[in-house]
Amino acid sequence: MTTDRSSQPSHPFDARTRLFLDRPQSRKWSLHPGRIGAWVAEMDFGVAPEIAEALHRAIDDENLGYLSPPQAAELGDATAEWMQDEYGWAVDPERVHPVSDVMAALGVAVQEYAPAGSPVIVPTPAYMPFLTYLPAIGHPVIEVSGVEIDGRWQHDLQRIDEAFAAGARTLVLCNPHNPTGTIVGREELEAIAEIVERHGGRVFADEIHAPLRYDGAPFVPYASVSAATAAHTVTGTSASKAWNIPGLKTAQLITSNDADQQLYKRFGFAVQHGAATLGVVASTAAYRAGKPWLTEVIAYLDGSRHELARLVNEHLPGAVYRVPEATYIGWIDTSALGIPGPPAEFFREQAGVVLTEGRLLGRGAEGHVRVVFATPRPILEEAFVAMGDAVRRAGLRV
């Protein structure tokens, strides 16, 4: 029986229309005018009022100069408080370093803490820039496809072991995982740590999506697992995804042992210089005062991740989507639809919906698309109705 969704209560986010979102200030919506943007990992829900107020105060106070040590220290305190309160991870605030973004933190992890030119293991599917940025700075990528066990994406531990044995020195560990939305649990983290330790390797832990978890799912920061993981890990995180402030260009690089901290002091100024003052102001406000807004957003996204399952089943029957445990990213296998050529290109041109092409996320991801569902649900439905119509018009398998 079909549910009459017209009688269901709406949310204020649902009132945000395409006309409102389709503005030149938005890369997500302006790069492909007239099409629905579901490709950039940012939300269409605005920003927490506490963050907006902090930014207005900073502007009123003419706080637009270079980042000051007290501001950096305050961000360190706020980040450490968040890590302790949310994950039980005791972080020394002095080991929280402002950087421009998580990619900058990754660059530090491989260029300063790993041998020059050493290969880096990237489990796939992966955040697209991991696969292009690392070779660009002289570190070859070894792609290791994940495996599906009981309907969940997991790391292929045997192949990670083999990649370290073949000469890799660093593993990129994205948790929660982008794009599958899997939260890597303690047992799997411990298994990864055993492999890394046995080979004398290192880990870059990208934990940017950690605040965006559903059903109260626990999250274990990799560096907190043991003394061994703390000794071989650089962590990159940011308020940018959970609080929707990516354009403010601020992230946090966290060192978790004395040796890494001492080394960072030798080059850290140049890296910290890339962090934006307003981004630090906004991030501090997010960690200290932004939880009520985040809680509301997660509740809305929780409904949307399940709504996406309905939309895929109704409009793209045969496509495979598994409801993510975290993030606002959906990973959809469209292989069974028989789309000729790259599916994201098909949906962009035939349905007016802009997604991310699976093949850009690594070998073996052909036939998939990545969809960002952090948009008003009426727009999400409009997108999948259009996608289903495009598949039917093309005479494909629906």
Go through each PLM region and give its residues.
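Conserved core segment of the aminotransferase class I/II
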Residues: 55, 227-302, 391
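A non-catalytic, amphipathic alpha-helix used as a structural packing/dimerization or gating element
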Residues: 74, 78, 259, 263-266, ...
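N-terminal small-domain helix-loop-helix segment of the aminotransferase-like
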Residues: 2-101, 108, 288-289, 394-397
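PLP-dependent enzyme catalytic core of the Aspartate aminotransferase-like
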Residues: 81, 346-355, 361-398
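Conserved glycine-rich beta-strand-loop-beta hairpin in the small C-terminal domain of fold type I
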Residues: 284, 301-309, 321-334
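Conserved core of the PLP fold type I
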Residues: 64-194, 211-212, 217-228, 234, ...
